[in-house]
């Protein structure tokens, strides 16, 4: 079981509560899917769950999943971030952090919502984030930079589905 963790937003410390076991199962599944789909010689690197990403002096975020692109200068830039929403604690992820990622021109954001058994896929353009898809039921989770990634929402949410 994971522990509570801290993020810094606008210089303010934000204590995030301990994720539930269903949340952690989804995070583990995401990591396994992405790890298996990353090309062998890719410049993309999957970080451990909730690795702190210092985005500015006053901003450190700890996404559930982060894939960074390494560049020759040794600086890594976020390429894909996924947040698994916690019931009762999703405002920070769905509004505040999503705006931060949009302002930083993050190429891809996945918002995983276990309440509705779907994933919202955002991409960035010149105006910020655009909702590109809402994946549910038999729709597969795919990504152009992860050629081997394909998992239906039905299969992905199976470990937490009730009934």
Can you name each region flagged by the protein language model?
Residues 1-163:
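Gly/Pro/Ser/Thr-rich low-complexity, intrinsically disordered segments predominantly at protein N-termini
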């Amino acid at each position: 079981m994971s522990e509570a963790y801290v993020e810094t937003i606008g210089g303010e410390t934000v204590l995030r509560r301990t994720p539930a076991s269903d949340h952690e199962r989804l995070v583990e599944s995401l990591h396994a899917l992405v790890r298996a789909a990353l090309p062998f010689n890719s410049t993309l690197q999957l970080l451990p769950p909730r690795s702190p990403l210092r985005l500015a002096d006053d901003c450190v975020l700890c996404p559930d999943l982060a894939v960074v692109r390494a560049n020759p200068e040794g600086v890594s830039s976020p390429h894909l971030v996924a947040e698994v929403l916690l019931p009762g604690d999703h405002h920070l992820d769905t509004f505040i952090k999503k705006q931060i990622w949009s302002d930083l021109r993050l190429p891809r954001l996945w918002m995983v919502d276990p309440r509705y058994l779907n994933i919202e896929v955002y991409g960035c353009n010149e105006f910020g984030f655009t909702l590109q898809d809402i994946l549910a039921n038999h729709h597969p989770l795919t990504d152009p930079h992860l050629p081997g990634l394909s998992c239906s929402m039905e299969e992905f949410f199976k470990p937490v589905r009730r009934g």
